[in-house]
């Protein structure tokens, strides 16, 4: 087995209190890795602390974790990528095990499933939201991950270089998960410790705002990845409403030969037309998506797997 080049990517914004310890922990766990801190418009001393700890600091001016991930995946070239947050909550000591799993099993992604060592590490709202989103992904895509929103992941080069990274914020973890599910990539999960933030470090994740954005991302990707099912559901609902409205009119017409409520009849007809249009739209878009998925699969296969 040849020596693999490893890049550790740590997105950061105002993590002066934690980034130094994070870099030091990953340096101890992966002494041969190159550690990058991608600063996202920090207003504190994050950059200087990261440099002092031995990290290479890059800057992404556009706010949002998704923008940082997009930039880092485009700029960094390595055989194996380790991504974690710079807030010292993830267990750096688990990284060698995750990398070994990726290489030996020839996987494209290993997810660090968070197991909190203290109740304060996982806020109740985040835990509930994670469970709901994980359940939605499982129902929509047929399979899912135990921790969809985990920010601790190890990737192969072909995953990183085939990932479009369209998200801008914290919904990027959801996009990463759906990318793996959509292309049926070989993946695995490893339970890792999840720690409380150091004093002075505060979470940038809003339970409701970012949860809503993640939910919209799932629905958008559902529409894009499964258009036949998405528009089929809409068409079915419209068709059922149309039939419910039309049945009393049909009964009255059969008895009297008259249509007593013309606007209602027009509404029923319009809804049925929309139902058919929705079905046909789903069929057309499904053909387009199959073509796009084939191109993405070919782009993925053009890159060498972990060795």
Which residues fall in each region the model found?
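Donor nucleotide-sugar binding loop of glycosyltransferases
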Residues: 15-18, 42, 65, 91
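Cell-envelope/extracellular polymer assembly enzymes that use nucleotide-activated donors
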Residues: 5-7, 34, 175
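Hydrophobic helical membrane-anchoring modules
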Residues: 1-2, 167, 172-307
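Short aromatic/hydrophobic "clamp" motif used to bind/position activated sugar donors
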Residues: 81
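Acceptor/aglycone-binding surface of glycosyltransferases and processive sugar-polymer synthases
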Residues: 61-75, 92-170, 174, 195-212, ...
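Short, well-formed alpha-helical segments that are part of the catalytic scaffolds
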Residues: 14-28
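Conserved donor nucleotide-binding strand/loop of the catalytic core
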Residues: 34-36, 47-75
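A conserved acidic beta->alpha catalytic loop
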Residues: 39-47, 88
């Amino acid at each position: 087995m040849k020596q693999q080049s490893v890049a550790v990517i740590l997105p950061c914004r105002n993590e002066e209190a934690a980034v130094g310890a994070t870099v030091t922990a990953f340096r101890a766990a992966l002494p041969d890795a190159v550690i990058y801190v991608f600063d996202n418009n920090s207003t504190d001393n994050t950059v200087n602390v990261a440099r002092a700890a031995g990290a290479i600091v890059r800057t992404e001016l556009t706010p949002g974790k998704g923008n940082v991930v997009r930039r880092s995946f485009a700029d960094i070239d390595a055989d194996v990528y380790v991504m974690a947050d710079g807030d010292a909550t993830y267990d750096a000591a688990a990284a060698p095990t995750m990398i070994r799993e990726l290489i030996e099993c020839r996987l494209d992604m290993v997810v660090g499933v968070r197991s909190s060592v203290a109740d304060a590490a996982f806020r109740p709202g985040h835990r509930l939201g994670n469970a709901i989103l994980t359940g939605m992904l499982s129902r929509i895509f047929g399979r899912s991950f135990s921790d969809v929103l985990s920010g601790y992941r190890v990737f192969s080069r072909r995953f990183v270089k085939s990932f479009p990274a369209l998200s801008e914020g914290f919904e990027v973890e959801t996009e990463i998960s759906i990318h793996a599910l959509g292309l049926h990539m070989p993946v695995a999960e490893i339970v890792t410790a999840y720690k409380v933030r150091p004093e002075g470090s505060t979470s940038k994740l809003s339970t409701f705002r970012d949860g809503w954005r993640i939910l919209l991302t799932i629905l958008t990707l559902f529409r894009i990845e499964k258009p036949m099912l998405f528009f089929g559901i809409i068409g079915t609902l419209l068709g059922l409403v149309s039939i419910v409205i039309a049945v009393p009119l049909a009964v009255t017409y059969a008895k009297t030969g008259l249509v007593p409520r013309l606007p209602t009849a027009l509404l029923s007809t319009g809804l049925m037309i929309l139902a058919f249009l929705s079905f046909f739209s789903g069929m057309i878009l499904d053909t387009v998506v199959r073509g796009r998925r084939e191109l993405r699969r070919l782009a993925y296969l053009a890159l060498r797997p972990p060795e």
